[in-house]
Amino acid sequence: MDRIRIVGGNELHGVIPISGAKNAALPLMIASLLTDDTLTLENVPHLADVEQLIRILGNHGADISVNGRRERQGESYARTVHFTSRNIVSTTAPYELVSKMRASFWVIGPLLAREGKARVSLPGGCAIGTRPVDLFIEGLAALGANIEIDGGYVNATAPAGGLIGARYVFPKVSVGATHVLMMAATLANGTTVLGNAAREPEVVDLAKCLNAMGAKISGQGTSTVTIEGVRSLSGARHRVLPDRIETGTYAMAVAMAGGDVILEDTEASLLDTALEAIRRAGAQISETNSGIRIVRNGAGIKPVDIVTDPFPGFPTDLQAQFMGLMTRSSGVSHITETIFENRFMHVQELARLGAKISLSGQTAKVEGVSRLKGAPVMATDLRASVSLVIAGLAAEGETMVSRVYHLDRGFERLEEKLTRCGAHVERVSD
């Protein structure tokens, strides 16, 4: 089993290209099930979750081809992937596939809209709280679907004439449920209005792609999204937007280790709140023609309080990384998680490196320390795993991170990108 070995103490200097966003690529790939034409996606990251979803889509009958080209001397892949779902051969998404990745549950929307039925296993993925599918089920039922849960599967059936446009207000903001209902509503009869919808850039990116396929969606990026149903969707070509979570992660890595790095092929507007928190922590941040420049030379890390919130608030997917940064601050910071319960599993592992963190409900109190010391640590989920890498960059000696398959789900060639900027990070196999 692979592990990541980090020897701390090196500053980061150079250029890091930012990959396409995993959180955008997954719903875009699933949207290919809505049409019998070819959907071509550019800038698709090479990640374990993407490969798993390719297998799932293939199970439904999608024909998938990949044209990869190496960029920057093998540093990363920017792949173009073609999806053609001319015939849906199965409307069942089995447990053995869906259990490995939560987002694969989202196929329920396109399958139900196009084929009138879907049988999808309840999902797996990161062990972050319960993350129930109630909102998906309630929303699809509002569009006229008959839904039953039996034997760990969600069985959904559309009315004889297809799904019916309706008004549905999410009781809480959900990116995944917004994705699913937006996709399902594109082929519904009539108009659907989604209230309290997620405003995340990935939702906007999906709507942009669906509109290119012939959908009629407006209001994306606001809390009210309107979808006028159409009879069918066509193929399209779409470029996946930059990964704002990867952008924020590497920005925090530079703030932690010190140095001067340009993050290429990304946009500051995708994560203004997070960048402002990093700036307040002591890093200098400026926009360049191709991305963002992060500099921290000499100045210490300042304590900053953050509260996670739906976009445009501080992203929950950057909470663990920011906690890693705060372990070396010059004071006390408070980090409050409002999106998911049980998303502090990284606290015990950071403590193994010498961090001083105490929990009270959904708030972590982080007392900055003058030094961290390398130790063996274990990744518990995707974002927690990279927080350990960030901490390891500033720790004295060697940090060995095990269970790095979590990292491979969401970070493309992380060790290579950091190494090219001067970090001592390597993948080792037992």
UniProtKB/Swiss-Prot annotation:
Pathway: Cell wall biogenesis; peptidoglycan biosynthesis. It is found in: Cytoplasm. UDP-N-acetyl-alpha-D-glucosamine binds at R102, R131, P132, V133, D134, L135, K172, V173, S174, V175, D317, I339. GO terms for biological process: cell division; cell wall organization; peptidoglycan biosynthetic process; regulation of cell shape; UDP-N-acetylgalactosamine biosynthetic process. It catalyses: phosphoenolpyruvate + UDP-N-acetyl-alpha-D-glucosamine = UDP-N-acetyl-3-O-(1-carboxyvinyl)-alpha-D-glucosamine + phosphate. Phosphoenolpyruvate binds at K22, N23. The modification 2-(S-cysteinyl)pyruvic acid O-phosphothioketal is found at C126. Its EC number is 2.5.1.7. It is an enzyme of class 2 (transferase). Keywords: Cell cycle, Cell division, Cell shape, Cell wall biogenesis/degradation, Cytoplasm, Peptidoglycan synthesis, Pyruvate, Transferase. One of its GO terms (cellular component) is cytoplasm. Cell wall formation. Adds enolpyruvyl to UDP-N-acetylglucosamine. Belongs to the EPSP synthase family. MurA subfamily. This is UDP-N-acetylglucosamine 1-carboxyvinyltransferase. The lineage of its organism: Bacteria, Pseudomonadati, Pseudomonadota, Alphaproteobacteria, Hyphomicrobiales. The gene is murA.
